Amino acid sequence: MISELFQTMHKARFSGIRIVPENSPSLQQSCVRAFVESVRQTKTQGDSEERLMQLQFLPAPLLTPILDRMCRYPELRDMLRDELTDPVLFMKLFNGYAPDYDTLEKCLREAARAGGRPAVLRDLANNYCDMLRTELRSALRKGETHGQQPRIRARVLESLRFGDYLYEAGWCRCGAEVLTLTQELIVLLLPHASRALQMECLVRLLRAQIGACMNARAAATVQRLLAFVVEIPAVGESGATTLLPLVKAYLQLGCYYYHVQDYDRCHQWALRALASAADGDAPAKGDVIDVLQLIALFCIAKERHDLGNMLISQAVQRARTEYGSLHRKYADVLQQYGFVLLRMNAILPAITAFTECLDITGRVYGLLSPHAVVLEGYLAHCLYLRSHTTGRFDMALRHAETALELASQLMPTSRRVRQQLEHTRDLILRGPDNRRDTKESQPSRERDFHSFTLHEIKEKFFELDSSFERDGLACSG
């Protein structure tokens, strides 16, 4: 039925004949509304599942409005969730000619509200990994992949984007699993076509593993990535392509060493990333923002608070200008800004930053996401510290309980997250720590800094970098 409706719609559209008022619903809108209404009416009769199977044969421009319409009806959330966890259907939307991520994320937010099953992206990632494993087994069983190179390459590019999307949505472990299988797919490509993809996959995989605290796997990925970085000069001299994400590689190596608290190596790779960074197109500007965050974290770890505050403030300003104030990447920078303020004992500004970040991530991913768990935990800790001044611990306890409840729903097997949140809750229940200094710092606010060019930032940092070396020599002497 639905295919005939859409064929009629296209014939009417191309005929150029309009027999309805200008402001009336289009034929496509009428078809979508009629289809979703019929699904609602037949849901209790047991044949609605058969009707929705036809969605797999529709292109993305027609799928999107149908799923968007389904979001209006709470009784269809379970059905919407089942459709979105189907990797074939989801990838049709994800890879659309002009992906409408706003609508897609709206559908994911609604599907997460289906009774007791909020982890939509986790289940989707598991189904997608099963699909990749099936394709890998099929390719290896046939033994001949030469004729399948275009299809394999398309799947690799899709998996790279999807793994990155899972990481950005807070599902770091799921993203790491997808990217691990992507590596196995890349091996099936011809060597000359796979080198750049191998390095790009390693960079993204390392980022996801760091986010998921998969330290042992991240250490192995670092060794493979270092081998690529060392070989690149020789590749360039031989005339081969050098279009490899060097800045991103330096950046993730620096992030790894910061994560394992090897600050000397973090400093080394941060310097190389900053020296290689350049303002240009949107990806290059994103690299600069990431480099500024890494160097700011390094400065805070070395207790250079003024420099760290200046650098993270530059990252916040650039992210707001580049992405806008309601973008997921701006929220990521804002979260790091809150963390830097917390490390500087600037509790009240940190609470403001984390609260704004929670509002943005709630608008993008909903409040049933791993981001909400982390941010609620940060807010609980900040409000606990703030409570030593105000004497009120109820707000801190409320955020801690919310974080624990979300963690039990979204990541019930993550003992590390639960232990950290339970520790925060225990501190709150224990009451004030009389040994704690309640005096808070008041650093310069982000908006107090004027925007520096990348050249000015490099000059300031490299000028001050010599002081790091002098301090290191003094300590060693």
What are these regions (language model features)?
Residues 183-190, 224-236, 272-279, 313-321, ...:
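Amphipathic alpha-helical segments of tetratricopeptide repeats
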Residues 146-153, 190-197, 234-244, 281-286, ...:
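Helix N-cap/loop-to-helix boundary motif
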Residues 1-177, 181-186:
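Cullin-RING E3 adaptor/co-adaptor recruitment helices
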Residues 116, 170-173, 213, 261, ...:
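Residue-level detector of the short coil/turn that links helix A to helix B
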Residues 175-178, 218, 266, 308, ...:
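Single-residue signature of alpha-solenoid repeat helices
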Residues 154-157, 161, 165, 197, ...:
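"A position-specific structural signal for the A-helix of alpha-solenoid helical repeats
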